Swiss-Prot record:
Annotated coiled-coil segments of the chain: none
A Gene Ontology term for the protein's cellular component: extracellular region
Activity regulation behaviour: Inhibited by EDTA and EGTA, but not by PMSF.
Motif (Metal-binding): 335-346
Lineage: Eukaryota, Metazoa, Chordata, Craniata, Vertebrata
Protein's UniProt name: Zinc metalloproteinase-disintegrin-like VAP1
EC number: 3.4.24.-
Names of the cofactor(s): Zn(2+)
Pfam families assigned to the protein according to its UniProt record, in alphabetical order: ADAM_CR, Disintegrin, Pep_M12B_propep, Reprolysin
Record-stated family: Belongs to the venom metalloproteinase (M12B) family. P-III subfamily. P-IIIc sub-subfamily.
Binding site for Ca(2+) 2: D469, M470, D472, D483, R484
Active site (UniProt): E336 (proton acceptor)
Record keywords, A-Z: Apoptosis, Calcium, Cell adhesion impairing toxin, Disulfide bond, Fibrinogenolytic toxin, Glycoprotein, Hemorrhagic toxin, Hemostasis impairing toxin, Hydrolase, Metal-binding, Metalloprotease, Protease, Pyrrolidone carboxylic acid, Secreted, Signal, Toxin, Zinc, Zymogen
Length: 610
């Protein structure tokens, strides 16, 4: 039996009320002074790390005892996290700091099922927690030789600017395409699998030169501000089955790389172009957000492209560092990321409970950590229509360049399993303290793993999804269920298509995906537009020039569909977005003639594309 020594760090425990104090969050008119008491369970003789994986604090709020349980946010950083800043002479300096022993936590209040907490424990406790439906902020009072903290409500912070802040997004963005509603029964198997898959957003943050000046030319202060913000964003998106990890941070500590200006529209366009032409070539990521110290025109606090995620030119947003309270800035950033993920502004009928929601057009003074029913529908319909691929990519072991972090749910180099922290792990096969398999276990997860043992050879582990797929079986030597599919070129869907990498791409399904249920393929005459070599019709691009289709290849260019809707009687319709010109082209492997399929904009023998 492991002996456990309960280490308690006790200070004065009596709270008292204060009338007014100037804190990092601003001038607070009504606050309560508390002295958090830390209670930590350590194995006897163990060395206490600087920041434990789990911590517990006790203090009183309004005279009532509160127990705050905290767990390290181990998914906060990606394995290849990097930081870039610039020397006074403009040299780029990029480092890969060890971030596994960070001080950022999520948590809950004991005996309060609806409670939440996002806390930095770097220098005392700083952040917010929800208690009995009320949102409180906590931060150290920074008194000499004292562990005193202030606990207060946001409403008691004096406002620097009474004018409400707004998001600048309107529905006239070129990147926005109206999304037709799709019921569950209309989903293709591929769309359903996509919806069910866990999503990952690799986030890159940039702080402009004014931010650097605002925080006293102190790189650590800017870095801390950014970390605090991401620590709030990650649990907001966890509820949407999206894991947000910070892959990189860049601080423009010498001069701005773009002309940051008070026109939010112009600044967003310039930032997005810089990301596409500069940042992406240096650091792989899915989404970038600029945090700026400039004041945008009017009440605008942020701006983002609607539906821009995974798009080279448009997966970006900008946010003004408009409040001393970091969680309000974090909500603004989560809001702009929401636009990138296909969510529009909430209407009056949208709800997420009693408080304002993340996608409200006006940024609320109240904490908004939930997405409304409308936002969830917007996001779902966006995913069904566009199926952005970058957010499906879970980091691979081979991507890891910094030390593996046991407890972050990612199986990395040197680990056999990773089931989370010792407190949350429920996997009988995995030792959460070492991320190694328990004695006698062959595996911890995988479709060919059953009760910690490999399933027998020949056991079916995945049924065939469709006629282009094959039933997959276990080898008896691995927990993995290797995906196999029918040979390419095999006829499918009543000879309307040919199997291509496990799928049966046919034009009819592609029209439905683009225009909704009821859409059909246009008549052959419509496809003759593909001989013009413009954005309405072409077969492929060479050096950014649209190449017209040859007569025999017209069905391997733009896809022409008939939506078959009361408001659209045009027999020849294409899906066109200037932000993603390739979307709406006939997919590779699609049947274009008898025994022929599309490959690189040409209609070739069915065996050629493979």
């Amino acid at each position: 039996m492991i002996q456990v020594l309960l280490v308690t760090i006790s200070l004065a425990v009596f709270p008292y009320q204060g009338s007014s104090v100037i804190l990092e969050s601003g001038n607070v008119n009504d606050y309560e002074v508390v002295y958090p008491r830390k209670v930590t369970a350590l194995p006897k003789g163990a060395v206490q790390p600087k920041y434990e994986d789990a911590m517990q604090y006790e203090f009183k709020v309004n005279g009532e005892p509160v127990v705050l349980h905290l767990e390290k946010n181990k998914g906060l950083f990606s394995e290849d996290y990097s930081e870039t800043h610039y020397s006074p002479d403009g040299r780029e300096i990029t480092t890969y700091p060890p971030v596994e022993d960070h001080c950022y936590y999520h948590g809950r209040i004991e005996n309060d099922a609806d409670s939440t907490a996002s806390i930095s424990a770097c220098n005392g406790l700083k952040g917010h927690f929800k208690l009995q439906g009320e949102m409180y902020l906590i931060e150290p009072l920074k008194l000499p030789d004292s562990e005193a903290h202030a606990v207060f409500k946001y409403e008691n912070v004096e406002k620097e600017d009474e004018a409400p802040k707004m998001c600048g997004v309107t529905q006239n963005w070129e990147s926005y395409e109206p999304i037709k509603k799709a019921s569950q029964s209309n989903l293709t198997p591929e769309q359903q699998r996509y919806l069910n898959a866990k999503k990952y957003v690799k986030l890159f943050l940039v702080a402009d030169y004014i931010m650097y000046l605002k925080y006293g030319r102190n790189l650590t202060a800017v870095r801390t501000r950014m970390y605090d913000i991401v620590n709030v964003i990650t649990p907001i998106y966890h509820r949407m089955n999206i894991h947000v990890a910070l892959v990189g941070l860049e601080i423009w500590s010498n001069t701005d790389k773009i002309i940051v200006q008070s026109s939010a529209d112009v600044t967003l366009d310039l930032f997005a172009k810089w990301r596409a032409t500069d940042l992406l070539s240096r650091k792989s990521h899915d989404n970038a957000q600029l945090l700026t110290g400039i004041n945008f025109n009017g009440p605008t606090a942020g701006l983002g492209y609607l539906g821009g995620i995974c798009n080279t030119m448009y997966s970006a947003g900008i946010v003004q560092d408009h409040s001393k309270i970091h969680h309000l800035v974090a909500i603004a950033m989560a809001h702009e990321m929401g636009h990138n993920l296909g969510m529009d502004h909430d209407k009056d009928t949208c709800t997420c409970g009693t408080r304002p929601c993340v996608m409200a057009g006006a940024l609320s003074c109240e904490a908004s950590f939930l997405f409304s029913d409308c936002s969830q529908k917007d996001h779902r319909e966006f995913l069904i229509k566009n199926m952005p691929q970058c957010i499906l990519k879970k980091p691979l072991k081979t991507d890891v360049v910094s030390p593996a972090v046991c407890g972050n749910y990612f199986v990395e180099v040197g680990e056999e399993c990773d089931c989370g922290s010792p407190r949350t792990c429920r996997d009988p096969c995995c030792d959460a303290t070492t991320c190694k398999l328990r004695q006698g276990a062959q595996c911890a997860e995988g479709l060919c793993c059953d009760q910690c043992r490999f399933k027998g050879a020949g056991t079916e582990c995945r049924a065939a999804k469709d006629e282009c797929d094959m039933a997959d079986v276990c080898t008896g030597r691995s927990a993995e269920c290797t995906d196999r599919f029918q040979r390419n070129g095999q006829p499918c869907k009543n000879n309307n298509g040919y199997c291509y990498n496990g799928k049966c791409p046919i034009m009819a399904d592609q029209c439905i995906a683009l225009f909704g249920p009821g859409a059909t393929v246009s008549q052959d005459a419509c496809f003759q537009f593909n001989r013009e070599g413009n954005h309405y019709g072409y077969c492929r691009k060479e050096q950014n020039t649209k190449i017209a289709c040859e007569p025999q290849d017209v069905k391997c260019g733009r896809l022409y569909c008939f939506p078959n809707s009361p408001e659209n009687k045009n027999p020849c319709n294409i899906y066109y977005s200037p932000n993603d010109e390739d979307k709406g082209m006939v997919l590779p492997g699609t049947k274009c003639a008898d025994r022929k399929a599309c490959s690189n904009g040409q209609c070739v023998d069915v065996t050629t594309p493979y």
